[in-house]
Every structure is written in C-alpha cells, then in structure tokens.
From Swiss-Prot:
<protein>
    <recommendedName>
        <fullName>Small ribosomal subunit protein uS19</fullName>
    </recommendedName>
</protein>
<keyword id="KW-0689">Ribosomal protein</keyword>
<dbReference type="InterPro" id="IPR005732">
    <property type="entry name" value="Ribosomal_uS19_bac-type"/>
</dbReference>
<dbReference type="GO" id="GO:0000028">
    <property type="term" value="P:ribosomal small subunit assembly"/>
</dbReference>
<comment type="function">
    <text>Protein S19 forms a complex with S13 that binds strongly to the 16S ribosomal RNA.</text>
</comment>
<dbReference type="GO" id="GO:0015935">
    <property type="term" value="C:small ribosomal subunit"/>
</dbReference>
<dbReference type="InterPro" id="IPR002222">
    <property type="entry name" value="Ribosomal_uS19"/>
</dbReference>
<dbReference type="InterPro" id="IPR020934">
    <property type="entry name" value="Ribosomal_uS19_CS"/>
</dbReference>
<dbReference type="Pfam" id="PF00203">
    <property type="entry name" value="Ribosomal_S19"/>
</dbReference>
<keyword id="KW-0699">rRNA-binding</keyword>
<comment type="similarity">
    <text>Belongs to the universal ribosomal protein uS19 family.</text>
</comment>
<dbReference type="GO" id="GO:0005737">
    <property type="term" value="C:cytoplasm"/>
</dbReference>
<dbReference type="GO" id="GO:0003735">
    <property type="term" value="F:structural constituent of ribosome"/>
</dbReference>
<dbReference type="GO" id="GO:0019843">
    <property type="term" value="F:rRNA binding"/>
</dbReference>
<keyword id="KW-0687">Ribonucleoprotein</keyword>
<dbReference type="GO" id="GO:0006412">
    <property type="term" value="P:translation"/>
</dbReference>
<keyword id="KW-0694">RNA-binding</keyword>
Length: 91
C-alpha cells in the first residue's frame, strides 16, 4: 500500500538539500546517505548516491527507471552464500 497523495513522497531533508545544492552547482560528486527509506525523485537522475547497507555505503547511480522507488531497494543488506550441499550425495 502506497503513501497518501496529499502527503507526497518521503525524502530526508538533508538528502534533498544536498541534491539541490549539487544541481545548482552542476556538481555530480557522490552523496553519502543512511536514509534507505527516501523515495527517488526526478531531480536525482544522473547523481550517484552511496546508500548504507548496514556495513558499507553502496554506490547507486540513479536512472529514469528508478524514479518512484526507494533508495534501500538498490542496496542489498544480506549476502547470499548459496545453499549447502548434501554430505551423503544423491540417492
């Protein structure tokens, strides 16, 4: 279930200020953020945002297809190492 239209999309104020500042200066340096719940807006297209996954910051390059999604969707928090093999072999 999505967020109410009258409220608008959620984006952290600090992240919004950093993106607007870079857009004014035509700067495309990496922006670090811990806000995985922030929605990707059209003004972020072309920026690289380093999203925290609990251990490190994962760089995410924002494209048009990502608009409307959350930043946390593109920074996985779990590493899948594969299923363990049977010790007995195949029966």
């Amino acid at each position: 279930m999505g967020r109410s239209l009258k409220k608008g999309p959620f984006i952290a104020d600090s992240l919004l200020r950093k993106v607007e500042k870079q857009n004014d200066n035509d700067d495309k340096s990496v922006i670090k953020t811990w806000s995985r719940a922030s929605t990707i807006l059209p003004m972020m297209i072309g920026h690289t945002i380093a999203v925290h996954n609990g251990r490190t910051h994962v760089p995410v390059f924002i494209t048009e297809q990502m608009v409307g999604h959350k930043l946390g969707e593109f920074a996985p928090t779990r590493t899948f190492k594969g299923h363990i093999r049977d010790k007995k072999g195949g029966r």
